[in-house]
Amino acid sequence: KYMNAGMLRSAINNRLVEWERIYGCDTSEDTFSLRLKGIIKRAYEQSGRQVVLLVDEYDSPMLDSNNNEELQAEIRGIMRDFFSPLKAQGEYLRFLFLTGISKFSQMSIFSELNNLQNISMQDAYSAICGITENELRTQLEEDIRRMAEANGETYDEACIHLKQQYDGYHFSENSEDIYNPFSLFNAFAQKKYANFWFS
């Protein structure tokens, strides 16, 4: 949890230090945004490939400070400054992938970026956050067989049981059924059917 702006600054600095160990640093880059810009450019130059930047739970600092308007404004400013160089990094970036529970347009962090797309409810991407029936049957067949054996079921009975217990998520109007990966992998690990999401 980000209880103060210093915690966010420390987390950003720690991540940048990790990347700078890999891609190098420039002492003239004295702000988070300049450091990020430099890291992206050096990663591109060293690899010869455009960078993919993944930001998981980008909205976590904002949500943690939801009940403190002053802190939230400070955190929003830090994040806006940190992400501000991304638009100008187009030649070095292949894409930016953000995950979070808040719409990025509501966070006022990415106002510099006018080409972001919310893909969370688009058919073409509806299966990226879970496991499809085909993936379950092809990639996890051995897990299903072990689950069936542990529960005295046939393979087909285990598939039905798994579908009833962990299937049914839809992320777009025409989405195929998606299995919850957290619950599914916990079921495989423990060899039992349970409501892992709620425990």
What residue spans do the PLM features occupy?
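Phosphate-binding site recognition
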Residues: 1-199
